[in-house]
Amino acid sequence: MSQLTTVARPYAKAAFDFALEQGQLDKWQEMLQFSALVAENEDVQHFIHSSSAATQVADTFIAICGDQLDQYGQNFIRVMAENKRLSALPSVFASFNQIRAEYESVKDVFVTSATPLTKAQEDKIAKAMKQKLNSEVRITTSIDASLIAGVIIRYDDVVIDGSSRGQLNRLSQELCL
């Protein structure tokens, strides 16, 4: 996975720089998202890896994407196909999003809760994290019933464990020492 990330970053940076220059960040994000979904398809993956003609791979991939790609998106796909990097498209999309978030000073915050959060709870967490990080935040939520209660908040390399499971684990470790 880290190898794909290393391969993907220059493509993502090039796409981001071009999209920014053209004022088309949203359009490029949509094109890369769609292309990444196509590249993740099992049949498409097999075709990408089994075919040796880069032109044929690029043309077929572009045909599958149809009107989702403009001429610049098609050129991007051709370059990736020539370099046999189409399988890295999901990582390119992820890197593009990361570069865009850094550019827009948006931090991704992942919140895992024992039960679904209400809109008010999400807003409260977002407000607190925005203040703590001194940055705009994008909240992504998930549910893990094994937490028992509470939440775990992750951003960058930081984990804030406010779950009952985490408290019980810490108590258990203290008692066993």
Curated annotation (Swiss-Prot):
InterPro entries: ATP_synth_OSCP/delta_N_sf, ATPase_OSCP/dsu
Membrane topology: Peripheral membrane protein
Molecular function as annotated in GO: proton-transporting ATP synthase activity, rotational mechanism
Domain of life: Bacteria
Transmembrane residue ranges: none
A GO term from the CC aspect: plasma membrane
Keywords from the UniProt entry: ATP synthesis, Cell inner membrane, Cell membrane, CF(1), Hydrogen ion transport, Ion transport, Membrane, Transport
Predominant place of localization: membrane
UniProt keyword annotation of Cell membrane present: yes
Keyword tRNA-binding: no
Pfam family, one: OSCP
Subcellular location: Cell inner membrane
Homology family: Belongs to the ATPase delta chain family.
Subunit-level organization: F-type ATPases have 2 components, F(1) - the catalytic core - and F(0) - the membrane proton channel. F(1) has five subunits: alpha(3), beta(3), gamma(1), delta(1), epsilon(1). F(0) has three main subunits: a(1), b(2) and c(10-14). The alpha and beta chains form an alternating ring which encloses part of the gamma chain. F(1) is attached to F(0) by a central stalk formed by the gamma and epsilon chains, while a peripheral stalk is formed by the delta and b chains.
Function description: F(1)F(0) ATP synthase produces ATP from ADP in the presence of a proton or sodium gradient. F-type ATPases consist of two structural domains, F(1) containing the extramembraneous catalytic core and F(0) containing the membrane proton channel, linked together by a central stalk and a peripheral stalk. During catalysis, ATP synthesis in the catalytic domain of F(1) is coupled via a rotary mechanism of the central stalk subunits to proton translocation. This protein is part of the stalk that links CF(0) to CF(1). It either transmits conformational changes from CF(0) to CF(1) or is implicated in proton conduction.
Protein name: ATP synthase subunit delta
Organism annotation: Glaesserella parasuis serovar 5 (strain SH0165) (Haemophilus parasuis)
Lineage: Bacteria, Pseudomonadati, Pseudomonadota, Gammaproteobacteria, Pasteurellales
